């Protein structure tokens, strides 16, 4: 028989019934959090260890600082302290002066941007053993930056400086020889022509001796002077007892060919290049071989005494100019108006505004409402100037004066380190590739500064004034010479010659050229170049054949379409 439990029996301890009174009284049981004693003690120990380590590091740092201060005070005397203060003050003043004079890209008004570009340039100077200052052979003195040269020579590490005269193919041979002779009195100078090919790899470098090269090879886009430049750097590695490798910094004004020089030495598109200033913005290192590393730097511009001169040297992008009319007015003051009018096909103008209006009408440059835009016409004229359609070059001063930042000891040291006498013959070989001009007419009296205007296909003679039947003389002003030297007007002038290429092709008589490959011509070339001539002839033949096949296919398609139309017409007539 089942035993019944009494309904009033109290539940035992620990059963569910004991929770009901607690809920009725409003009391809640405290929740207990389970901690692992081992885990708790490990966290506390790690925090204590971190605090002790931080304290020990701070104490050690204070002891080291105190030891350094004690050693510094022990070694320093009053005289050395005064010398140190003067040296730091001089460095600070020089840095401030350079920051004011070296205005990188004057169209950028942000001071922080200019300082950032200056830091990139200073990094290149600091990391380099040899500095290559690239100059435009058309205006070498206008492209030189004496503040930059002074910074290089005053830098720690006994930096070496070499001048590279680039774009020698744009200047007659006699002019380049005069500039080489003039610049070698100051620093080692190397003649160079960068490659103008647009391919990515295997840029052509002329290894054939210049005296054996044909005229077509000399007028090609190949690089000249690279072997001579590499010989100069090799002489520094040999005579300077360089054990590992050297870093070579490439500096200069914008658009003088710094990146093109690096690409020509590397024989590949290692750096970005362009016909506008400001392509390179940061320092870039290029490995040439296991001994030489090249450092590309942004273009630098000396503090311009004349903004017009900076614009005409292509240091500022033409499309970013706020006032493009003033530089065009300067060009008109320096050029023969008859030649300018025949070049642009305009006539009857008396002022710069009339000239720009006529050019705008000729080129179709209009604003809203059909008004001719003088600003767009001025930018088009400046684009012709900076692109080389209106070519020019300058001549060195008749008397040479050593700049203030160079001394006879520095010149002698540079000559001995690079062994320039060994490379003079190579420079002469490079000069053989240039065109020969009439030097007697060009190297005349250079005081005051004169300008001559000549056509590209005419001899280099002075153009007579149509009104007075005499030579027209123009003063250039701040366009060339020592840009940053206050006494530049007393140091000599340079002569500037301007070429004008006619815009209309009908104005120039062009003789037809036979483009068919002839074996007799190939056999007449030098044996070292017969393979290249044969490959070029075959390539030209393939191009002509491809053009002929394309024309034949187009004619056959037109004939088939005409036959189809005639057949359809006959069928419709028969029906």
Swiss-Prot record:
SUPFAM superfamilies: P-loop containing nucleoside triphosphate hydrolases (SSF52540). One of its GO terms (biological process) is ribosome biogenesis. Residues 1-75 are annotated as: Disordered. Gene3D superfamilies: 1.10.1580.10, P-loop containing nucleotide triphosphate hydrolases. It comes from the Eukaryota. CDD domains: Nucleostemin_like. Residues 118-303 form the CP-type G domain. It is found in: Nucleus, Nucleolus. Keywords: Coiled coil, GTP-binding, Isopeptide bond, Nucleotide-binding, Nucleus, Ribosome biogenesis, Ubl conjugation. Residues 9-28 are annotated as: Required for nucleolar localization. InterPro entries: G_CP_dom, GTP-bd, GTP-bd_ortho_bundle_sf, P-loop_NTPase, TRAFAC_YlqF/YawG_RiboMat. Residues 42-72 have a biased composition (Basic and acidic residues). PROSITE patterns: G_CP. GO terms for molecular function: GTP binding. There is a cross-link at residue 470 (Glycyl lysine isopeptide (Lys-Gly) (interchain with G-Cter in SUMO1)). Belongs to the TRAFAC class YlqF/YawG GTPase family. In contrast to other GTP-binding proteins, this family is characterized by a circular permutation of the GTPase motifs described by a G4-G1-G3 pattern. Stabilizes TERF1 telomeric association by preventing TERF1 recruitment by PML. Stabilizes TERF1 protein by preventing its ubiquitination and hence proteasomal degradation. Does so by interfering with TERF1-binding to FBXO4 E3 ubiquitin-protein ligase. Required for cell proliferation. By stabilizing TRF1 protein during mitosis, promotes metaphase-to-anaphase transition. Stabilizes MDM2 protein by preventing its ubiquitination, and hence proteasomal degradation. By acting on MDM2, may affect TP53 activity. Required for normal processing of ribosomal pre-rRNA. Binds GTP. This is Guanine nucleotide-binding protein-like 3-like protein. It comes from Bos taurus (Bovine).
